[in-house]
Amino acid sequence: MANSASGLAVNDECKFKFQELKTRRGFRFIVFKIDDKAMEIKVERLGQTAEGYEDFAATLPADECRYAVYDLDFVTDENCQKSKIFFFSWSPDTARTRSKMLYASSKDRFRRELDGIQCEIQATDPSEMSLDIIRARAH
């Protein structure tokens, strides 16, 4: 179904791979990209479970927008192992204005397609999504 604000559709693979991350923990992260030609949101990269947060952060381009989800494992103050799924809206200052507008107008609709997101991060610079910030948001 197309997004009324931006006219974008969400490729079914986005939802299937997210369900796999959420239920079977088949991936550590998923990076999504808007395909301008097809006018839809598609899976760009799947991060394997052995990949860490630094690997994930390195996949986000310095001058292009992306959406992503990351499955963060952490230990609580009570020494309990937990996991939270983060949604990232990556919109660097150096990205094209049209791209930033397209990602911004599609974000809420796309995020609603991914049922089970627990935290959201909007970042324009890597410092806004450091591992310390993510861990603090998880608790």
From Swiss-Prot:
| Gene Ontology biological-process annotations | actin filament depolymerization
Gene Ontology molecular function terms on file: actin filament binding
Instruction: Report the InterPro entries cross-referenced here.
Output: ADF-H, ADF-H/Gelsolin-like_dom_sf, ADF/Cofilin
Q: Which domain of life is it from?
A: Eukaryota
**ADF-H domain location:** 7-139
Function of the molecule: Actin-depolymerizing protein. Severs actin filaments (F-actin) and binds to actin monomers.
Listed name of the protein: Actin-depolymerizing factor 9
What organism does this protein naturally occur in? Oryza sativa subsp. japonica (Rice)
